Regions:
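Bacterial N-terminal signal peptides that target proteins for export
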Residues: 1-9
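Bacterial N-terminal signal peptides
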Residues: 8-18
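Exported/periplasmic ABC-transporter solute-binding proteins
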Residues: 20-52, 56-61, 65, 69-73, ...
């Protein structure tokens, strides 16, 4: 793996509110969220707090697989929002959750290049001038598995395999491209569409037929009225509309 400088976008946790090492008390939620949700949930947290001012949110962003392992080891999260629904399903089967698993969105992927690059994002993966291509680590990042599948589907995996650099999660993958550690890469469409990044780069959306459906699922790990309220908001028309703004397909599609 290529190790870049500290990620501009959180590698381990970006906290909205005050994080703690114990289970969150009533009115405070500790959320483990897939890195592709960073910008969408930042906007969503503000929307949620306006309607639920009594609830404090502490949102941690990282790879879905790593969060699943942490929950198995007793990490004090109240809600788990994974980029791959299979992780929360496995936790639920093993009796490690307090609620049923729910689908909250379907993710999409895109090739991204910085505005300073001369590469065309639609052809960048095949460009012989490209030396490094960033993707998330397929071993524990669902978007990495989708990227790997897309490279196979596009018929170019073998020709680019030695160019691949692996990010710990999809946010670090984007940071590799931003920093120049990679010439281009495959990121979550939700990151490419973030308002703060629209002026920094260009993207080409990879056809959904090129990779398995990225069904994103969540589950309440520790039951509380606040956790149930957050789940209701996320699946509500306003929550789903916000996710759509960031390139996700709604849960019911």
């Amino acid at each position: 793996m290529v190790r870049g400088p500290s990620a501009i976008i959180s590698l381990a946790a970006i906290v909205l509110g005050t994080a703690c090492g114990h289970h969150a008390p009533a009115g405070k939620l500790s959320i483990a969220a897939a890195a592709d949700l960073q910008f969408a949930l930042a906007a969503g947290a503000q929307q949620f707090r306006e309607k639920n001012p009594q609830t404090e949110l502490a949102i941690n962003y990282g790879s879905s697989g790593n969060f699943s392992t942490q929950i198995r080891n007793g990490a004090p999260f109240d809600i788990y929002l994974s980029a791959d629904i299979q992780y929360p399903r496995a936790l639920a089967r093993d009796g490690l959750t307090a609620g049923s698993v729910f689908t909250y969105a379907t993710g999409k992927i895109a090739v991204w290049v910085t505005n300073s690059s001369k590469l065309d994002p639609a052809t960048a993966l095949r460009d012989p001038a490209v030396r490094r291509i960033a993707i998330a680590n397929p071993q524990h990042a669902p978007y990495g598995r989708a990227a790997e599948a897309a490279l196979h589907s596009l018929g170019i995996y073998e020709s680019v395999e030695k160019k691949l650099v692996l990010g710990e999660n999809i946010s670090q993958t984007l940071q590799f491209i931003q920093s120049g550690a990679a010439d281009t890469g495959i990121v979550a469409l939700s990151l490419a569409l973030a308002p703060s990044l629209r002026g920094q780069g260009r993207y080409w959306q990879i056809p959904a037929s090129a990779y398995p459906k990225i069904e994103q699922g969540g589950v309440i790990v520790k039951d509380s009225a606040a956790a149930r309220q957050f789940r209701l908001w996320l699946l509500s028309p306003s929550g789903q509309a916000l996710l759509r703004e960031y390139g996700f397909s709604p849960a019911d599609e």
